[in-house]
């Protein structure tokens, strides 16, 4: 029985298979209870995201956990085994710490996974499938993830186009809170840009899209204003920042439109970030004195530099997870030592109580007290030295001098 981590992720399986092993929010409570019943400790946590499904169990057998996963989702066991990774004990601990720190993510160092790990732990607590070991493991993991964030630069540099666009705006404007932003398009990239802007305190966001309904649907989540592409000339003069990402085959913003907007702004600077391919903003806009135009190529060069920086930070983070996983295993081993001592004491007391009861019965039946005491001492001695004697005999026969030396030291034989 071991501490085990079983998983499937974006590196080992296709989207189709990842969808099949995923757990819905409605099913995960009962699923964890079912999984926990397969462990000796009753401890289990299921982490299920779009990129990974992982099972963490204490006092479990890895093969049995995989069999449970196959049975639960009615999947072929061999197909599942081909895409599954297994970690035990320290390797399992380190894997969880790496996952929570973003070291195993599709985007290196992404912070969202830590929240997902925390949510999985909360769900397990609610299901009653955690105890001392899993509780300590996950609490330590959260501390390690925080340590990685504070002691390395793994999360400091932008590695997505959306994040890079917002990061560029932060470098140009001392604060984004007072800026007015015009977003053109309503796809996934623009939605992610809007999220990053909101996270940075931007209060005024206008979303322009060819389909007004799509823009309105997106704006509900960000308290933004939706407009059509035809309304852009009316709103452009108010925009300090313009970020565009559409699928339009022709430019949406021309030099003339931007030039007119800048005159209305009395030549206050405007940052324009064109994420689209082909371009949404005419290249000539960059020739205007108060327009600062950046394209997706400019962002990619920033992302490449930042990815190199993250990889360097990841090397430092790997050392942290290695050290902290070893410390956790030391704690776990000490816990097991305490359990072993308790079991040994309990076993000895059971033997003592059994033999004392037998001796008292003989005395009650009129047995000779001296003979009863001698017999008690002999029986107690024989029972207590039986297991150590067997261990010494096996070590001697096998020529295992290391074990023999350890046994002699434990039994205090070298003191005489």
From Swiss-Prot:
Q: What is its EC number?
A: 1.2.1.70
Q: Which UniProt keywords apply?
A: NADP, Oxidoreductase, Porphyrin biosynthesis
Name the catalytic site residues.
50
Q: Which residues bind NADP(+)?
A: 185-190
Any one GO molecular-function label of the UniProt entry: glutamyl-tRNA reductase activity
Could you tell me what reaction this enzyme catalyses? (S)-4-amino-5-oxopentanoate + tRNA(Glu) + NADP(+) = L-glutamyl-tRNA(Glu) + NADPH + H(+)
Q: Which Gene3D superfamilies match?
A: Glutamyl-tRNA reductase, N-terminal domain (3.30.460.30), NAD(P)-binding Rossmann-like Domain (3.40.50.720)
Q: Name any Gene Ontology BP term.
A: protoporphyrinogen IX biosynthetic process from glutamate
Q: What protein family is recorded? A: Belongs to the glutamyl-tRNA reductase family.
User: What does the record give as the function of this protein?
Assistant: Catalyzes the NADPH-dependent reduction of glutamyl-tRNA(Glu) to glutamate 1-semialdehyde (GSA).
- Whom does it interact with, and what assembly results? Homodimer.
Report the protein name in the record: Glutamyl-tRNA reductase
Q: What is the lineage of its organism?
A: Bacteria, Pseudomonadati, Pseudomonadota, Gammaproteobacteria, Alteromonadales
């Amino acid at each position: 029985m071991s501490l085990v981590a079983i998983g499937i992720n974006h590196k080992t399986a296709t989207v189709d298979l990842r969808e099949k092993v995923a757990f819905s929010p409605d099913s995960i409570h009962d699923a964890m209870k079912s999984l926990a019943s397969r462990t000796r400790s009753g401890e289990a946590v299921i982490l299920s995201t779009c990129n990974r499904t992982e099972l963490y169990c204490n006092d479990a057998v890895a093969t049995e956990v995989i069999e449970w996963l196959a049975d639960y989702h009615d999947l072929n066991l061999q197909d599942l085994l081909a895409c599954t990774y297994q970690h035990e004990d320290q390797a399992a601990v380190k894997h969880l710490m790496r996952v929570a720190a973003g070291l195993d993510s599709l985007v290196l160092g992404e912070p969202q996974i830590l929240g997902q790990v925390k949510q999985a732990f909360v769900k397990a607590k609610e299901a009653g499938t955690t105890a001392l070991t899993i509780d300590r493991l996950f609490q330590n993991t959260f501390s390690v993830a925080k340590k990685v964030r504070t002691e390395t630069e793994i999360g400091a540099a932008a590695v997505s186009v959306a994040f890079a666009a917002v990061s560029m705006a932060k470098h140009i404007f001392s604060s984004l809170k007072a800026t007015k932003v015009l977003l053109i398009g309503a796809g996934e990239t623009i939605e992610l840009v809007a999220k990053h802007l909101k996270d940075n305190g931007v209060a005024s966001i206008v979303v322009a899209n060819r389909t007004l309904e799509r823009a309105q649907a997106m704006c509900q989540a960000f308290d933004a204003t939706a407009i059509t592409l035809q309304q852009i000339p009316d709103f452009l003069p108010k925009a300090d920042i313009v970020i565009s990402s559409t699928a339009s085959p022709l430019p949406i913003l021309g030099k003339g439109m931007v030039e007119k907007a800048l005159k209305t702004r009395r030549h206050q600077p405007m940052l324009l970030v064109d994420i689209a391919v082909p371009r949404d903003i005419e290249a000539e806009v960059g020739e205007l004195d108060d327009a600062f135009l950046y394209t997706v190529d400019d962002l990619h060069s920033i992302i490449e530099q930042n990815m190199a920086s993250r990889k360097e930070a990841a090397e430092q983070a790997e050392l942290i997870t290695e050290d902290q996983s070893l410390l956790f295993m030391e704690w776990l081993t000490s816990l097991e030592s305490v359990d072993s001592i308790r079991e040994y004491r309990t076993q000895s007391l059971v033997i003592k109580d059994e033999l004392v009861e037998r001796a008292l019965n003989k005395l009650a039946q009129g047995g000779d007290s001296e003979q009863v005491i001698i017999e008690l001492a002999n029986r107690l001695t024989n029972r207590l030295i039986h297991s150590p004697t067997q261990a010494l005999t096996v070590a001697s026969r096998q020529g295992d001098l290391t074990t023999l030396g350890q046994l002699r030291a434990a039994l205090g034989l070298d003191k005489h």
